[in-house]
């Protein structure tokens, strides 16, 4: 089960996001550098929040946290899939702000959510749960799990 959680974190990993760069450039009005800056900013913000998620994991346990991570990742993927629609709606709501500025903030939020719930919490909870389940042969169990993730 933990291996499925680790594999579920792929949409939050660089390899899961990078394939959409050209699509995002075309539809958000951002250039490659701005997309990269948004990704970096989302990643840094996520890294600052991850210790709090670790404390919540210690407090609530793996079942609650894997549910929250899965729900958050699902919402992040929904936002990511509807970026163009959300950007159009934002342009109508705040007409004075340029499309690229709105696109930049939307992409920062989207990347923050993808990195936090996918690469961050989902990976952390899944790997820690695997380590808790196995007292003996922990390295072997981790290696078997790694076969499916690699």
Where are these regions (language model features)?
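Intracellular juxtamembrane helix-capping segments at the cytosolic ends
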Residues: 24, 115-134, 142
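Helix-to-loop junctions at the C-terminal end of transmembrane segments
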Residues: 48-62
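Extracytoplasmic
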Residues: 1-32, 49-53
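Hydrophobic core of transmembrane alpha-helices in multi-pass small-molecule transporters
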Residues: 7, 76, 89-121
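Short hydrophobic/small-residue motifs within alpha-helical transmembrane segments
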Residues: 43-44, 150
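Juxtamembrane helix-start elements in MFS-like secondary transporters
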Residues: 30-39, 103, 142
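Glycine-rich segments within core transmembrane alpha-helices of 12-TM secondary carriers
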Residues: 134-150
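Structural signature of the two symmetry-related core transmembrane helices
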Residues: 64-79
């Amino acid at each position: 089960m933990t291996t499925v959680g680790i594999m579920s974190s792929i949409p939050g990993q660089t390899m899961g996001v990078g394939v959409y760069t050209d699509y995002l450039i075309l539809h958000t009005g951002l250039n490659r550098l701005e997309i990269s800056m948004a990704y970096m900013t989302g990643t840094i913000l996520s890294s600052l929040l991850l210790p709090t998620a670790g404390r919540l994991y210690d407090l609530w346990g793996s079942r609650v946290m894997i549910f929250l991570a899965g729900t958050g990742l699902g919402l992040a993927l929904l936002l990511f899939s509807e970026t163009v629609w959300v950007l159009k709606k934002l342009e109508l709501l705040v007409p004075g702000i340029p499309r690229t500025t709105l696109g930049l903030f939307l992409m920062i939020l989207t990347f923050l959510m993808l990195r936090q719930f996918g690469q961050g919490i989902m990976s952390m909870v899944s790997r820690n749960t695997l380590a808790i389940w196995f007292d003996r042969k922990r390295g072997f169990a981790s290696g078997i799990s790694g076969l499916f993730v690699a």
